Amino acid sequence: MTQNNANEAKGFYRLSWIQRIGFGSGDLAQNLIYQTVSMYLLFFYTNIFGLDPAAAAVMFLVVRIVDVIWDPLVGTFVDKHNPRWGKYRSYLVLGGIPLTGLAILCFWNGFSGSLLYAYVTYVGMSMLYTLINVPYGALNSSLTRDTNEITILTSTRMFMANVGGLAVSAGIPCLVAALAVGKVPAETIEMALFMGLGSLPSFIFMPLVPAIKRKVGKKNMFYIFLSVAIVGMAMLYIISRMGTVKENIVLIYIAQFIKSTGVIVATGYMWALVPEVISYGEYTSGRRISGIVNALTGIFFKAGMALGGVVPGLVLAWTGYKAAEQSSTLPADPDAWFRAMLIFALAGLALLIFCFTQTKERVVMDEKDVKDVKVSDLWTEFFRNRPLRVIALFFITAFAMMSVGNAAGAYFMNDLELQTPLAQEGIRWLVCVIPAILLVVAMFIISKYELEDDVIDEINREIENRAKTE
């Protein structure tokens, strides 16, 4: 038996590039759907659907509270069941079809101004997203134990995710404008470029992450890129006070690129920590409860999104933001928004199906342990697994930062100059100051993470040695 075959027999699988891309297409699909919701739904609700910003902010918080209850139920269900299409991959199709439908309905203006309709569609969409995202997250740790392969998988996944992010951030403004007025105004192109720069660094730096990590180490990589993001945010704040956005558009593009470089690498690589804490949990408890751990990470990032999601609406309401009626960069044509979401959601569904066809689970929980999984395992694992608690705080902080910045980006480029000085300052704080403060907190949190690569490799070898003696 060759060394590679021997390693694969122990669970240290090497994947082909088509398998890596297939796995990453699942995150691309989710970004086409969920990133559209995250970046533009608040704008759609306040400027087109007709909801009060404060009411929309409260709704975003309520949806995240529902997620806190729903996520552990999904994680437990996933760990306890083995659908015939695959323990984790089955849900890409089973959840993907209804998710597509509800995501489209979130951008339908048929019940304009109805808070009840907004709640029903948004809550339902979020619950279905969990039904895909939790097993998809567990799918990563089921493909291999090899830490280098997991790093490549994570880099590929985040590269693909940012393809989706670029399509959403730059593509949605242009597509909506084209569908609404038959052409894309120069102002819309400027906004699309600004939003698109949020994803562009992924294509440059995410393929380099494995090499960067080997050169400087895991923690130092986080410190470096979180600091880069803070510098970019400081530049955005200063430049936005030097004159109008249009007057300083090139400088704003540069600052946005710098900010996005730091954010993308740091928040992209954090997903590689999840398989590590799953292996650590298996090492300490003897059970590989991937669904439970990914349900926990789902709670963490949705808790961050809850905190980050409620902040923009409240800040906008407190500072007296008024929706622009005539000079807005983004069109207010409800039919154009509906058709744009229809296109993106259907593309996302096709990619989920492709991900399903290209993935194969190899490292999963033993059948004898499946029946013993229960919801309380979620909190048992949380309190037993110290590295899991560290990444919990990091996920909450990172996603709060991204949620605040993403939701406010459309306002920053769309109608900053049309607002009162107080409302302008509120938008600047949402885009620059609050996210920068959260990144400083994130740096302190990641300093407490203790699972270096040599420790994880030793843990995985010990797990395999135990399996051979049983």
Regions found by a protein language model. Name each.
Residues 2-470:
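Membrane-embedded alpha-helical bundles of multi-pass transporters/translocases
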